[in-house]
UniProtKB/Swiss-Prot annotation:
GO terms for biological process: symbiont entry into host cell. It is found in: Virion. Phi KhT, a host-range mutant of phi K, can grow on E.coli C and B, besides K12, and is more thermosensitive than the parental phage phi K. Coiled coil: none annotated. Assembles to form an icosahedral capsid with a T=1 symmetry, about 30 nm in diameter, and consisting of 60 capsid proteins F. Upon virus binding to host cell, one of the spikes dissociates from the capsid and the virus interacts with LPS through the exposed EF loops on the F proteins. After the genome had been ejected, the channel formed by the F proteins at the unique fivefold axis remains open. It comes from the Viruses. This is Capsid protein F. It comes from Enterobacteria phage phiK. Keywords: Capsid protein, T=1 icosahedral capsid protein, Viral genome ejection through host cell envelope, Viral penetration into host cytoplasm, Virion, Virus entry into host cell.
Amino acid sequence: MSNVQTSAEREIVDLSHLAFDCGMIGRLKTVSWTPVIAGDSFELDAVGALRLSPLRRGLAIDSKVDFFTFYIPHRHVYGDQWIQFMRDGVDASPLPSVTTTKYPDDAGYVGTIVPKSNRIPKFLHQSYLNIYNNYFRAPWMPERTEANPSNLDRDDSRYGFRCCHLKTIWSAPLPPETKLAEQMGIESNSIDIMGLQAAYAQLHTEQERTYFMQRYRDVISSFGGSTSYDADNRPLLVMHTDFWASGYDVDGTDQSSLGQFSGRVQQTFKHSVPRFFVPEHGVMMTLMLVRFPPISPLEHHYLVGRNNLTYTDLAGDPALIGNLPPREISYQDLFRDGRPGIKIKVAESIWYRTHPDYVNYKYQLLEGFPFLDDAPGTTSGDDLQKAILIDHNDYNACFQSQQLLQWNNQARYNVNVYRHIPTVRDSIMTS
């Protein structure tokens, strides 16, 4: 009888680790990742402290912080190659890696240092792309499809991809392809009533898909069904935690800084994932996103930018609001120096559903507050996508120094995995 070990009891494995990370405002950063095996049960309890770099001025507004933990099967990354890999076992061809640049921090977006070979596993890079494309990219924006990290912009590879501003009237418009009118051909002397109803129905289903069902899972949900994350190879969002990071002002006490003060932000946090059963090999990735509310001293209410107010603008008539098509406006209608070439489409009377922030213009004359100095898109031409995505450079003037970039965190990720794996002693004492 052979004494070769072919199985193992399911034991708890402690994969806890510390992470000292830093990043930029508005960029999606991987802060922890753990490879997992089919049959695992994964638990995470992350505790730590988030700090913003020293602020130049007093603390004006809190920042919004989001933590996300995703599960991504390797099969979503490698496809049929992964299935064949597992079938062939020890005779399988090695899985390919992807190339990076030679700088140590150019894989920071996936939470690792670049090794000497300047290559990292493909599952890290592609899993990050899948997460971004499914959860952090507006559906009308083109997907990110870079085959290798070396193809990325250096800021993207070091700090993560740019994400959208928090929702406002100008940062969350309707898709650019939204129709403002719909034509129906009719005969000269008659109207097909049944055809008219059919046209209404067709328009309704087209609008539903344009506005609310741009992804397959949303379409199926509209029928009362649901789809597995396998249906469209999307990462599974296991847990999301969000909070507002606040702080305090520090008064200067020495002779040179007496009477001056600056803001300090230090916020403790906890992000927990209850026990999650892993159905097949993959990776658990935890990502972090820090954003300031998008506030500009140049923003004004939509009604303020209208020279001649019409009944439709001002009355808030429910009959009109419920039946008029979307309205096309420009950034010039919302910002003093907004670009007229940046057109957005919004629901009728959206200005009665939201209200802009107000900042006295004196703030515009000072540097150091976490406000947008210019109207969004001022430096990027008439590109709506660039106007909606956060540019961390807009906040450079807020910080006294960026030695640890714009935010940093120190955290312990308490990871316990229940796993079928022989003990270290069994591995040493082979056969």
